[in-house]
């Protein structure tokens, strides 16, 4: 369970106020770290505007003081202005590296001093690390050295660094641009096109060594590292959270209703909740995450109790995100009802199952269902290219025959890991709209290729120097093993596929029938379930047009029961093709439905069985007239004129009319 820390509470954070030693502004102690990280980048050494006549003006005229003097000045000013409050360095202990400035209200326009990277060396107690690695920009993460040096937020870091580079005229590699053109830090595209056959339609990432890429890919899954933090970076769901949608307006206004996010795996449900969480913390809203796979009812009650206390004492809202909410049973879901109704919590649930079947109707009526669709191939390519660029991998045009591995240049500005553009397109297609599968498949393919090259060099006795590593389409396919088939035996897709199979056979489309059968079996469906449905189809849709169809279906069921998968799949395929080609008749099916409709619509008690049709096993029954007047048909050579329906239903033909 993840709960936002107490430093996000505006009531508690106002108890201790400290003054920034650079810009002299007062602020809560919990926000001094993130403020100093930006303030030091925006103000050069000693360039904060002091009051008129201050002795600091003379010091600034003489030039910046050494780092030691600046450190002493911070301690002295903090001690003089806030004797009962710990210094900013001490107050930063125990804080996370989230970089959230909470209720901070100062803006960058209030500073008139030009930015300079020398501000990072002013006060060692609050260091500001710099890194030119493109991975931090693309992935929103800092390298290990930068993470150990400070706790500035990735977004503040990138904006300050971009402003510095723009004003200083320095490119992404730290070299001045002498030609006056903007250099995004990529290696020479023209030279790459000429030497390596690089695709002109792809962005050129900054060159990174293979070992750097390996270190970046180790640890957390790539899908988690690439998770966006803002709606602007959220790709592929414009229909649900596009610019003109109601939900987008509510999220940007921080008016978040109770939501049920419904969509296939990897479409962005958890990511959207992550974006809402980041935005909520900026507005001092408590955000709690639970997973229905391991949470219990007591965990939910504890969260609700805390939410009630937060609302009563601090007027603070609580958003509760339940991942895989369909895993909760009906009684567990009922726990949310009164608290969602009265506004104690705002519930956000994520599910891959149809909420109409898996979520209580009462709870569903109190939430807005947001349908997230499977990501299109174009969106998948965009997501994969963002990850590839952030890793410093270069995309090659596979239509050009030049092999980058054949070049022996060891120039450090050239990329060391390449991937074919065809491999990117194949990965986007095989992921089947699942961004998690695509990104993790890319991670696995790159790591496997780097590892295999290292093992080859070790076995051959060569020095391991992976200056040229190429990821091909086959590497991507091997990483995924097979196409990502979306199928859930207990979910909506189960019923969707069997319905499609039934309708394809009814329409005599043998190709489509085989496709839907294979999709179910390859997705892990029980073959006996399919065989039972075929037995039903034999009588419902074929009926008397081909009476042998029923025998075919029963034989297929018995065969599946005897031999099982995968051998029985051809038995089912034979039966499905036979049914698709067979003539169709619903005469029996329709007539029986007419009989059921007649019985259900009959007014009053049902008519009795005529006496001549009743059995008379005893003398008393015979004396009462049971069986009297019945004509035994085999005793007559001609058809017998005899009524077999109750008197009220005489003349009714269920094969020709729908109702009696």
From Swiss-Prot:
Forms homooligomers, possibly octamers. Directly interacts with POLD1, POLD2 and POLD4. Interacts with the N-terminal domain of WRN. Interacts (via UBZ4-type zinc finger) with monoubiquitin and polyubiquitin. Interacts with TRIM14 and PPP6C; these interactions positively regulate the RIGI signaling pathway. Pfam families: AAA, AAA_assoc_2, MgsA_C, zf-WRNIP1_ubi. The keyword Membrane does not apply. PANTHER family: ATPASE WRNIP1, WERNER HELICASE-INTERACTING PROTEIN 1 FAMILY MEMBER. This is ATPase WRNIP1. The lineage of its organism: Eukaryota, Metazoa, Chordata, Craniata, Vertebrata. Its main location: nucleus. Residues 76-89 have a biased composition (Polar residues). Belongs to the AAA ATPase family. RarA/MGS1/WRNIP1 subfamily.
